[in-house]
Swiss-Prot record:
Species: Clostridium acetobutylicum (strain ATCC 824 / DSM 792 / JCM 1419 / IAM 19013 / LMG 5710 / NBRC 13948 / NRRL B-527 / VKM B-1787 / 2291 / W)
Protein name: L-arabinose isomerase 1
Pathway assigned in UniProt: Carbohydrate degradation; L-arabinose degradation via L-ribulose; D-xylulose 5-phosphate from L-arabinose (bacterial route): step 1/3
Cellular component terms per the entry's GO annotation: cytosol
Pfam families cross-referenced by the UniProt entry: AraA_central, AraA_N, Arabinose_Iso_C
Length: 488
């Protein structure tokens, strides 16, 4: 099981020496109280550490250098308790290489109208400091996040928590390594991409391996380990033998277990956290990896089919952000076009992620009419319901583009007893026709990552961190604006 590391966020408060020691001591006291309260709220996924009260350019530059080189620091949260002249922030901000959140808050929620004087105004002037600090971030074209509101407010704490998830993903993205078993599916366009640019812009390492490398690792797997894993299945899944001979069923499931163990060992040896397969590159294998892929998805590995390394890496990135909850590789497959009930059925040949399962999956062995191999085992289930996004990344030759579509995953209106794959059904926003048109006009791929744990804003925040052109298709979308934006 892939686990997220324990990282932290530093809290840096801006002021200046003009206000005197007494005022600065009050600023420190208030800052520590805010940090302690946020940490004790139970709302944040990672701890905040009050690091310093910055009153000079040298202090700011030095703390930024430390933020950059300390591996345990995922990002920085800044707050302007008072006015902090922004020229002091230029050198440090230019050096900053990690995510930045500007918390536009104030220590006191209410203005004390009956007692307010200039001493109070000088100490509590976040409105003044926010604008000076915001200007320099805009001038430096810093893709920072701004959260506004009272620091005890539930919504403010929720926004900080959601940004933390994204910031963690941004930092961890540098360690994403994708193993490609075989090349891209022949003649498919949208799964191609510039791997060098992806490593420069997103930090992703993408390596190719012949399928024989995986087969060699599979051949090292012991029958004892295969049998032990099969026994575990009896508690985890529904073993649905169907019309199969019991021995035939068990052997075909165990072949997927052999693939799973071999794959895991290969990935662990090379520190790979995502991978791709291709049904056209299966020499030496008895089955296309199906159940094996799904089992590794459940452990946090990113995946995409047909050699689509961009989607595999994006999948792993979102699994990091969501702690591997309700997130997986998806493919737009078929439409429901009945008036007023339009929706999209997403699935894949085999490899639908079980973190998206709404119920206990069934292990099924059915023939696969593609790849020319034995009938593979796979998990079958209906997908979860709720609000989420589907996200696609494409290479336009001159640059990468990200598409984010807000969706509502829904329960299928009928059973599909003859469909031998897991599925997720969703209604795209703002409505079916405009969403599909916008997706097609913008060049969106058929492969996506579907997640019910991230919001449009979170994915958009990440895209800003990496300087990625992004098209959002949601309840605010105007189709003409999308066409105009994508026709430049």
């Amino acid at each position: 099981m892939l686990k997220n590391k324990k990282l932290e966020f530093w809290f840096v408060v801006g002021s200046q020496n003009l206000y005197g020691e007494e005022a600065l001591n009050a600023v420190k006291k208030d800052s520590k109280e805010i940090v302690d309260s946020l940490n004790e709220s139970g709302k944040l996924p990672y701890p905040i550490v009050f690091k310093t009260l910055a009153t000079s350019a040298d202090e700011i530059k030095n703390i930024v250098k430390e933020i950059n080189y300390r591996d345990e620091v995922a990002g920085v949260i800044t707050w302007m308790h008072t006015f902090s002249p922004a020229k002091m922030w230029i050198a440090g901000t230019k050096l900053l290489q990690k995510p930045l959140l500007h918390l536009a808050t104030q220590f006191n929620e209410n203005i004390p109208w009956k007692t307010i004087d200039m001493d109070y105004m000088n100490l509590h002037q976040s409105a003044h400091g926010d604008r000076e600090y915001g200007f320099i971030n805009a001038r430096l074209n810093k893709n920072n996040k701004v959260v506004v509101g009272y620091w005890k407010d539930n919504q403010v704490q929720k926004e900080i928590a959601e940004w933390m998830q994204v910031a963690y993903g941004y930092v961890a993205s540098e360690n994403i390594k994708v193993a490609r078993f075989g090349d891209n599916m022949r003649n498919v366009a949208v799964t191609e991409g510039d791997k060098v640019e992806a490593q420069i812009q997103f930090g992703w390492t993408v390596d190719y391996f012949a399928i024989g490398d995986l087969v060699a690792e599979m051949n090292k797997v012991s029958q004892k380990d295969i049998d032990a894993t099969y026994e575990e299945f009896k508690d985890i899944y529904i073993l649905d033998i169907g019309d199969n001979d019991p021995e035939f069923y068990e052997n075909h499931v165990k072949e997927q277990i052999k693939i799973e163990i071999g794959l895991r060992n290969f990935l662990e040896a090379g520190n790979y956290t995502a991978f791709t397969t291709n049904f056209e590159d299966l020499y030496g294998m008895k089955q296309l990896p199906g159940l094996a892929v799904q089992r590794l998805n459940a452990e946090g590995y990113g995946f995409a089919g047909e050699g689509d390394w961009k989607t595999a890496a994006l999948n792993r990135l979102f699994k990091i952000m969501t702690d591997n909850k309700k997130t997986g590789f998806m493919e737009d497959y078929t439409y429901e076009l009945s008036a007023g009930n339009e929706r999209i059925l997403g699935a894949h040949m085999l490899e639908v992620d079980p973190t998206l399962a709404a119920s206990k999956p069934r292990v099924v062995v059915k023939p696969l009419g593609i790849g020319d191999k034995e009938a593979p085992a796979r998990l079958i289930f209906d997908g979860v319901v709720g609000d989420g996004v589907v996200v696609s990344m494409l290479d336009l030759g001159t640059h990468y583009r990200l598409l984010i579509n807000e969706v509502k995953a829904v329960k299928p209106t009928e059973d599909a007893p003859n469909l031998p794959v897991a599925k997720l059904v969703w209604q795209p926003q703002p409505n079916f026709k405009d969403a599909v048109k916008a997706w097609i006009y913008a060049g969106g791929g058929h492969h996506t990552v579907a997640t019910l744990e991230l919001t449009v804003e979170q994915v958009y925040d990440w895209s800003r961190m990496v300087g990625l052109e992004t098209i959002v298709i949601d309840h605010n979308t105007n189709l003409r604006d999308i066409i105009k934006e994508t026709s430049r």
